[in-house]
Structures are given as C-alpha cells and as structure tokens.
Amino acid sequence: MDEVGVLTALVEEYSPSGHEGDAVQRFIEVSRSLGFTAHADAVGNGIARIGEGRPSIMFLGHIDTVEGRLPVRLDGDRLHGRGACDAKGALAAALVAAHRHDGPGEIVVVGAV
C-alpha cells in the first residue's frame, strides 16, 4: 500500500469523537498490511508496533474527527476528506515512515481515541 492508499484508507472511515471504533479497526488493518503488529488497547486506542529493541520511539495522533461527513476525493496531489490533515494525515505519515525505517529499534504508532 502506498502513501496515498494509507491516507485514503484512514480518511474513508468516519470517526467523530466518541465513535472511533471502526476507524481504529481500519488503522489496525492498515498497520498489519504494512508489517506492524497491531491491536486495540483496553480503552480503544489503536497501537501499532514495528521493529524491536532500543531505541523505542512513539508517534501519537488522534483518530477522531469533528462530526459531519465529507466525501473523500483525490484532486491532483491533494486528498480531501475529514481528518486528511488533522490528524489522520500525521498518522498515515508516521505509519509509512516507520514501515520504511530500516534502522535499529522499535517504532510505536498510536491512533488515540
């Protein structure tokens, strides 16, 4: 899955505050497709891990959005949709960067509810 595919997959899931469950499941599916181990923790946050050992680095972004559905569309090199830049865009960037990282250590990406 390329960068645009990762972002599109996350943005396509509607996730207004308090109703993030489906978006967390999508985050987990996307993470696993990139080679992460991933699960939801006890409060519903999506936790994705790749690599092992030290150093350990964590990226955290919120997965909820404001209410109101917007159509997801690609317009040239811009993806439009709820959460594309706040903060699903940052989560997508963290997942792709961690997936491509070939150095030592563990990277944890958290999609917080």
Language model features with spans:
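A general secondary-structure junction signal
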Residues: A42, G111-V113
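N-terminal helical capping/dimerization or prosegment-like subdomains
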Residues: M1-M58
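Active-site metal-coordination/substrate-binding segment of hydrolases
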Residues: R54-G111
